Amino acid sequence: MSGFDELARRYLASWNERDPVRRRALVDELWTDDAGYVDPIVAAEGRDAIEEVMATAQRQFPGLVYRPAGKADGHHDVARLAWELAPDGGPAVIVGLAVMVTERSRLRRVHGFLDPVPAVTTSPGAGR
């Protein structure tokens, strides 16, 4: 497994982790202190905000899981990962692409692209 494949596996595992304590541990392990995440509907700066976006997405898309839609690849500290959001074993309802900027094997920035862009917001705190 390449370093980028392992990074992608851990990235998706953090989005799928339902337990807030375990999810936070994954975020702290995977992301740099000054990390940022953006997609068409949210911008999050710092690990607290990134973890809250993940929690909010889980509340808004209950029963769906993030899974890879191919192998991750990359070069020069930048990786890309095609992924899907779907019911376990079912067809994808959203497909996406994560462009991951890394620093010492950790995530520094992730730029997400979604198709289709959901009508709901994943702004931190939404869906509570």
Walk through the language-model features, giving the residues of each.
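C-terminal and inter-domain tail/linker signature
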Residues: 1-128
